[in-house]
Amino acid sequence: LATVINSLAVQDVLEQTGQKAKVLTSFPMGPVAEPYSRDAAEAYLKEGTVVIFAGGTGNPYFSTDTAAVLRAAEIGADMILLAKNIDGVYSADPKKDPNAVKFDRITYAKVLADSLQVMDLPATALAKENHIPVMIFALADPQNIQRVVTGERTGTIVEEEE
């Protein structure tokens, strides 16, 4: 339910800037959000609406990160915008290591090799396998949503080798 609430907040921020947005959930939410279907997501995207996926996959044992990557792969997304409680990917946990360095860009191979736990392993592997870059940015700053949607760089981009 928390992802649905967060998704509705993101939708509100986008709509305040004039960007149409639609929340699609893995389970019925009445008038609040529409149940996910690939066809509906693709139709919204074709009309220029930002689609926000919420509620995971609707199946146990799958994280919301894995759900985001799965949905992105299903619709052929160019990039995943992943708002987190951290502002990007670091060489170590910045809360524990004051020398941790934030990456502007990092490869999936390095994330996996160094066990950088920015997304869970299945999500990272699925994004890598489907060649989908992921922009990880801080949800704490509401302006970040507008920044990333308008193409401004913030956070870290996780991608394949260049």
Predicted feature locations:
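C-terminal catalytic "cap/lid" subdomain
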Residues: 1-162
